[in-house]
């Protein structure tokens, strides 16, 4: 199945998990852009090396993660988790940030994009894993996390996905804002 371009279609955002981390699962962004273009995506743009892509196309958005993952696995030998959403959903996640304008340093805010709704999330345990100065907010499509001491020093951050009970991929707030800006262009 190829993605087909159709004027007026929503722009889509793809978030790949676990690529270019610690020298593993190397996927240069030019190669990702080329691969997405070969799949029929139009106006493909990427941001930094962590696997963020914005493109236009006309395809079943639910089928795209598997299509993209399979194409990467065939060409590069590994199949990363891929989340794809309409730019309108991505924008609603950006607009829904409960920490916007409320934290001293927006770099301390992170968003985990959920592959599906976390209906079985262990919210009570999530609260107990947060340090006193940390906080989170869970919605249908995202987990917002404020980590003033840094995400690397947070026990919550390393356990969040397990406690959510669903696959997720995280981005810092600066990256989220840049992807949103790209999707608006």
Label each region the model flagged:
Residues 3-185:
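Surface-exposed, charge/polar-rich loops and edge strands
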């Amino acid at each position: 199945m190829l993605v087909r371009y159709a004027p007026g279609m929503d722009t889509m955002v793809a978030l790949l998990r676990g690529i270019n981390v610690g020298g593993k699962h190397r996927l240069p962004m030019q190669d990702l852009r080329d691969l997405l273009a070969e799949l029929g995506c139009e106006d493909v743009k990427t941001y930094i090396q962590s696997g963020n892509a914005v493109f236009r196309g006309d395809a079943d958005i639910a089928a795209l993660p598997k299509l993209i993952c399979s194409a990467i696995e065939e060409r590069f030998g590994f199949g990363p988790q891929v989340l794809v959403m309409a730019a309108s959903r991505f924008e609603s996640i950006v607009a829904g940030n409960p920490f916007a304008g409320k934290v001293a340093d927006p770099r301390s805010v992170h968003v985990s994009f959920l592959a599906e709704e976390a209906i079985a999330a262990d919210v009570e345990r999530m609260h107990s894993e947060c340090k006193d100065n940390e906080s989170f907010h869970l919605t249908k499509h995202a987990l917002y996390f404020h980590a003033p001491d840094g995400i690397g020093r947070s026990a919550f951050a390393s356990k969040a996905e397990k406690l959510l009970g669903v696959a997720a991929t995280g981005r810092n707030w600066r990256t989220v804002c840049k992807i949103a800006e790209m999707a608006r262009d």
